Amino acid sequence: MARYRGPVEKLERRLGVSLAMKGERRLAGKSALDKRPYAPGQHGQRKAKISEYGLQLREKQKAKFMYGVSEKQFRRLFAEAARKDGNTGALLIQLLEQRLDNVVYRMGFATTRRFARQLVTHGHILVNGKRVDIPSYRVEAGQKIEVIEKSKNNPQISRAIELTAQTGIVAWVDVEKDKRFGIFTRKPEREEVIIPVEERYIVELYSK
């Protein structure tokens, strides 16, 4: 299954959560989910009973769409998490958080992961001084993530940094906003990652 490229706000309403895909509108309380917090369509306001499988599928979709990964990428990451010692669900979230596009977003250089992915694919991001244009690149502790020199005054990046003052920066990165770089200091603990996903349902889904 390819990466989702459809209407973002309709997807958020269907899943019932903000996926941080339209950051500035969401922060301003102007997203479709804020105005109409129910599923789209004629019967969207009805509360339908959801099955166990439906719950499992919904949580997987939320994680996939939030981090912008394809089904193939998601399965590969889950398989890797399942091979490791520890809580599979927590390890899956940790692997998703280590994606370069997500780290760029977490450092406040982009208002959404979608824009962060564009910054990476268009060559605006350096990792330890070398250009990396692969959004799925895995960032390790101690690596320096930097906006290239000619893009440091990009108005969209500057606006994202301004908005970060409202949302704050996560604890596992250190960022020099004015210099447009940050250090990924460590892998996050699960309880530090505040996302509306119950990964235990994802583990149940893939464990069948």
UniProtKB/Swiss-Prot annotation:
Organism taxonomic ancestry: Bacteria, Pseudomonadati, Campylobacterota, Epsilonproteobacteria, Campylobacterales
Nucleotide-binding among keywords: no
Entry superkingdom: Bacteria
A molecular function (GO) term: rRNA binding
Name of this protein: Small ribosomal subunit protein uS4
Family as reported in the entry's similarity comment: Belongs to the universal ribosomal protein uS4 family.
Cellular component annotations (GO), alphabetically ordered: small ribosomal subunit
SMART domains: Ribosomal_S4, S4
Keywords per UniProt: Ribonucleoprotein, Ribosomal protein, RNA-binding, rRNA-binding
Keyword field contains Transmembrane: no
PANTHER family assigned: 30S 40S RIBOSOMAL PROTEIN, SMALL RIBOSOMAL SUBUNIT PROTEIN US4M
GO BP: any one term: translation
Subunit organization: Part of the 30S ribosomal subunit. Contacts protein S5. The interaction surface between S4 and S5 is involved in control of translational fidelity.
Function recorded in the entry: One of the primary rRNA binding proteins, it binds directly to 16S rRNA where it nucleates assembly of the body of the 30S subunit. With S5 and S12 plays an important role in translational accuracy.
Residue span(s) of domain S4 RNA-binding: 98-161
